[in-house]
């Protein structure tokens, strides 16, 4: 996240962004505090704020600890973020980076509502949002670089594996 934080247009928002609470929190320890915006557990509102920031030329990095939480923002994702360019006849090409994960299953399986991977299903309905599943640690930095530097008018969902935080 240090790489993303260097860009003056980036803002990090989500649950446990400014205060500890998820495995992702530790990855933000070097991000300046003025770039961190803690959001209450209100996923649709979070992605709505994210969309508004993107429409104002920021590059929001919106963090959802697990896919299962991102599901609650589906309206903002499918009906808004994915359609801005189409609805505006090309006037708005927003860039959003959504960070999520598939919940850790080791050392203890947390139950099925925490380990969902909906990547393939969402790939079928999203046209201006690319989903990149980070299967190997070596893919992480190049994928975030692509998300930040892309100029094709697409936003990016980066899907991490929760077990990386415990094992890598």
What are the residue ranges of the model-derived segments?
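Thiamine diphosphate
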Residues: 1-167
């Amino acid at each position: 996240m240090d790489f993303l934080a260097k860009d003056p247009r980036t803002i990090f928002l989500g649950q446990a962004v400014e205060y500890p609470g998820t495995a992702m929190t530790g990855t933000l320890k070097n991000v300046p505090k003025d770039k961190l915006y803690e959001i209450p557990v209100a996923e649709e509102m979070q992605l709505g704020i994210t969309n508004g920031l993107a429409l104002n030329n920021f590059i929001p990095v919106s963090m959802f600890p697990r896919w299962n939480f991102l599901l609650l923002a589906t309206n903002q994702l499918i009906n808004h973020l994915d359609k801005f360019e189409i609805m505006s006849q090309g006037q708005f090409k927003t860039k959003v980076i959504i960070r999520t994960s598939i919940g850790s299953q080791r050392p203890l399986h947390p139950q099925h509502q925490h380990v969902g991977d909906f990547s393939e299903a969402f790939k079928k309905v999203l046209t201006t949002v690319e989903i990149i599943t980070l299967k190997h640690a070596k893919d992480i930095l190049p994928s975030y670089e692509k998300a930040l530097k892309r100029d094709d008018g697409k936003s990016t969902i980066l899907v991490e594996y929760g077990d990386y935080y415990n094992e890598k």
